[in-house]
């Protein structure tokens, strides 16, 4: 039986009924009714928000043609990158133009060099990458896939293209690229740590100028960094770093840098493979191929590109001396005191006779810097310079900048410290004072000091030609000949100027030996080394060239043992010692007595 029970409900208050009715009316109201006439549509931004302004027309730019087209508009700089340069390797060489007082580096010295290239990204941006050039493989080999998977080149910058570029090129704004602290165009993290530098001050860093030429573009910038003064009592790198007066007084350090971006050859120069029996600096990479059973390390020497004119090639093969299309030219820094310039020039020109053994005439020379040429800059990577450095360091050094793909030397900036004169003065006074009265003065006359400068100039130029120290060359001089006037003046006391043999300290007053028997000179080993590095061959591959030189080296060393090379790192070999003289290093002291 179903029982129905009526439940008596309590009436709802009128207020709650009205609220429910209003809520339902709003919820089901048509959109046209919900929009106030003349008011904003639902979801629209309030009137207080700023409306999008029409895009400003792009400025008309006056472009200077060169490697990169260069234009400036107000504070912004632009590059026009031709499509033909995408993927082309470019060497970016950054140097100090001006440094801060108290630093261990000076204006004119190199900060870094990097091989860079431009590339289009999938999003349309222009990428700037660095190519470390450390691993190679042949296109088409299966292992090439593995090599590519292990050699992604780093992206330094991603730049959005401007809309105003001419057909066939991409225009990008490069202001922030060079005003910022991007490592290829600034200091490395290690350099900043060594000088206790902090972050870049953007308001005190700017582009000074950008100049462009057919094969290179030059960017000069001023960069200001905060300075973290080292605390002597605190351990760690900051306490060991350089204390810079400008930093301690101002809290910041300002530097002027120049980056020279020079286009590398589309086809690299054919390398000459390194051979440890001849003392050259070398570069290289790791090579992978399908046919290998062991990974190869390819090493090649660093050397300048010397090429004969087509009409001279056969003459050179017949043994005639010919002039190269592009000789090696060094310029003398105009900061060099005038009295020393002729001796620095002579030290460079002395290498001409060594190049003659390789088949070249007038292959190398030095000139004074043409100060009236506005298109030349000493920071420009097209020019090699002996830079005169205002430094108390008693030294000089000879580096080079080369194409990392082939070893082709592109330029060199020899660092010539002003105080190197104290070093050669003391060497000469101690070693030769017994036989040369001129050596007994505290201040040498210009002729003697000039001769000593000439010797150091030749030694440092040798490094910039690719040559390493040969500590073993003096070990082939018969010790008894060091006091033989006729012999030592004809042959010299060491067969290489790249040795650390300095001067003939065995000679005695009664021997009557002149400066030809006291000074080092460019000698038989140096000529042989230049022949090995710079004599052209017709071989199509580096391997064929290497096999030829292997035979030449064997034959030459058998015939002339004094051409043996004993480089740095051979200190355990008694023949390759520093500051020694003659075949038996222990005997010269007895011979001189």
Identify the role of each PLM range:
Residues 397, 402, 408-416, 457-465, ...:
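Extended catalytic-interface subdomain
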Residues 474-593:
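Conserved catalytic/binding loops enriched for acidic/polar residues
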Residues 21-28:
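Bacterial N-terminal signal peptides
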Residues 7-20:
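Bacterial N-terminal signal peptides that target proteins for export
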Residues 43-45, 368-389, 451-458, 462-508:
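The catalytic-center signature of Zn2+-dependent metalloproteases
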Residues 36-336, 354, 358, 363, ...:
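Auxiliary tRNA-acceptor-end handling modules of aminoacyl-tRNA synthetases
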Residues 28-34:
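Sec/Tat signal peptide C-region and signal peptidase I cleavage site
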Residues 349-360, 462-463, 467, 503:
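Sec-exported extracytoplasmic/periplasmic mature domains
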């Amino acid at each position: 039986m179903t029982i129905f029970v009526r439940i008596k409900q309590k009436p709802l208050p009128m207020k709650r009924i009205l609220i429910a009715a209003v809520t339902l009316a709003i919820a089901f109201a048509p959109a046209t009714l919900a929009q106030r006439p003349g008011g904003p549509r639902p979801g629209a931004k309030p009137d207080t928000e700023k409306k999008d302004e029409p895009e400003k027309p792009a400025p008309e730019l006056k472009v200077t043609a060169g490697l990169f087209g260069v234009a400036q508009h107000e504070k912004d700089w632009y590059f026009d990158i031709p499509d033909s340069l995408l993927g082309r390797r470019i060497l970016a060489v950054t140097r100090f133009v001006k440094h801060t007082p108290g630093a261990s580096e000076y204006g004119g010295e190199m900060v870094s060099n990097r091989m860079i290239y431009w590339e289009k990204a999938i999003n349309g941006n222009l990428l700037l990458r660095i190519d470390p050039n450390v691993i190679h493989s042949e296109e088409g080999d299966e292992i090439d896939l593995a090599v590519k998977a292990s050699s992604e080149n780093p992206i330094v910058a991603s730049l959005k293209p401007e809309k105003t570029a001419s057909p066939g090129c991409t225009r990008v704004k490069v202001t922030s690229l060079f005003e910022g602290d991007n490592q290829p165009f600034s200091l490395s993290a290690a350099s900043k740590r060594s000088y206790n530098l902090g972050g870049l001050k953007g308001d005190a860093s700017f582009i000074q100028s950008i100049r462009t030429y057919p094969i290179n573009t030059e960017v000069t910038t001023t960069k200001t960094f905060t300075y973290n003064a080292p605390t002597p009592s605190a351990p760690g790198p900051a306490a060991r770093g350089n204390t810079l007066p400008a930093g301690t007084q101002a809290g910041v350090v300002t530097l002027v840098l120049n980056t020279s971006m020079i286009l590398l050859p589309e086809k690299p120069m054919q390398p000459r493979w390194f051979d440890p029996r001849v003392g050259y600096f070398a570069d290289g990479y790791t090579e992978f191929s399908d046919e290998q059973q062991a990974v190869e390390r390819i090493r090649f020497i660093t050397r300048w590109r010397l090429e004969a004119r087509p009409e001279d090639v056969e003459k050179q093969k017949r043994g005639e001396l010919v002039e190269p299309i592009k000789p090696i030219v060094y310029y003398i820094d105009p900061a060099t005191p005038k009295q020393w310039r002729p001796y620095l020039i002579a030290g460079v020109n002395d290498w001409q006779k060594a190049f003659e053994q390789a088949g070249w005439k007038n292959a190398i020379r030095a000139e004074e810097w043409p100060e009236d040429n506005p298109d030349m800059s000493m920071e420009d990577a097209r020019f090699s310079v002996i830079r005169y450095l205002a430094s108390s360091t008693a030294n000089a050094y000879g580096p080079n900048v080369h194409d990392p793909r082939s070893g082709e030397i592109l330029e060199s900036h020899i660092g010539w410290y002003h105080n190197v004169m104290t070093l050669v003065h003391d060497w000469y006074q101690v070693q030769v004072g017994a036989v040369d009265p001129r050596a007994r003065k505290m201040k040498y006359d210009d002729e003697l000091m000039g001769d000593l400068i000439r010797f150091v100039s030749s030694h440092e130029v040798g490094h910039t030609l690719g040559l390493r120290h040969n500590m073993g060359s003096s070990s082939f001089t018969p010790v008894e000949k060091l006091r033989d006037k006729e012999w030592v003046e004809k042959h010299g006391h060491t067969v290489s100027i790249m040795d650390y043999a300095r001067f003939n300290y065995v000679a005695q007053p009664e021997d009557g030996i002149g400066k030809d028997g006291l000074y080092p000179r460019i000698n038989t080993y140096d000529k042989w080394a230049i022949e090995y590095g710079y004599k052209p061959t017709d071989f199509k591959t580096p391997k064929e060239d290497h096999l030829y030189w292997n035979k030449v080296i064997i034959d030459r060393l058998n015939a002339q043992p004094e051409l043996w090379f004993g480089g740095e790192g051979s200190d355990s070999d008694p023949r390759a010692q520093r500051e020694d003289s003659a075949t038996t290093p222990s005997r010269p002291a007895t011979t001189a007595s």
